[in-house]
Amino acid sequence: KTTVTQMIAAVLRADASQPSMSTQGNLNNEIGVPLTLFNLRASHRRAVIELGMNHPGEIEVLARYAQPTIGLVNNAQREHQEFMATVEAVARENAEVIRALPAHGVAVFPAFDAYTPLWRELAGKRQTLTFGFEAGDVQAHEIAWTDGAWQFTLVASAQALPCRLNIAGRHNILNALAATACALAAGMKLADIVKGLESFEPVKGRSKSCQWQISGHAYTLVDDTYNANPDSVRAAIDVLAELPAPRLLVLGDMGEVGQQGAEFHA
């Protein structure tokens, strides 16, 4: 969530005519969300507010604070399983942001996910925007990893524009598509959205890569240490697999994985 939040923030900043603000760091809980909302000023026309949870019922409360007009459910993963028990519980909890939308609100979610039917049902008669690699209202075509960045064609609103994304991990293209859908719902032009995506810099500890030169050898370090669940670790391994050999994977513990902890770490 944090990466896509900051992507949306970067995109919103590309439209200087509409001042915006966003969640900083990980201020996404029952304390952080109110603190973030206190930073809203009359001059702000747009805001992106991250809602976090690790227990049932938290998103409903935070969404009541934030009162969103655009609600993004980015995915549902095996996170916080110690308290959420199942991925479906995570999907339903995340969907509380859709329930909180007004009748004129816009629900944004993946075009093809196991829980897409659930999110679409909860959206009801509200407008929806979906995203996916080659399906949905916002798509990415002709994807290639070149010179330390993703190059792809961003397709939306009957337009197709080239885009460069400066972050490792194919899954982060989906984050970019989610950010694009939210920005379109907020009334932004696709050309400005591309400018914002291309200005995005990875958040510390979240797929942030750096280059080292040691004894005449070039090394790429991808730092994804901020937090982890089984699905995000799988995504991190996929990032490593995309890099040239030799490769080294360094893993720590995953927290809040519940009774399946031993299985997930095996």
Q: Regions from the language model: what does each represent?
A:
Residues 70-219, 245:
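Acidic, Mg2+-coordinating active-site environments of NTP-dependent enzymes
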Residues 47, 221, 249-250:
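Residue-level marker for buried hydrophobic side chains located in beta-strands
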Residues 1-109, 118-124, 183:
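Phosphate-binding loop of NTP-binding sites
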Residues 53, 77-78, 113, 226-228, ...:
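Short, glycine/acidic-enriched loop or turn micro-motifs at the edges of active sites
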Residues 34, 59, 84-87, 176-177, ...:
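Conserved strand-to-helix beginnings and helix N-cap segments that scaffold or border functional pockets
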Residues 50, 220-229:
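Active-site-proximal beta-strand elements of phosphoester/diester hydrolases
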Residues 203-205, 225-266:
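Active-site beta-alpha connecting loops in nucleotide-dependent enzymes
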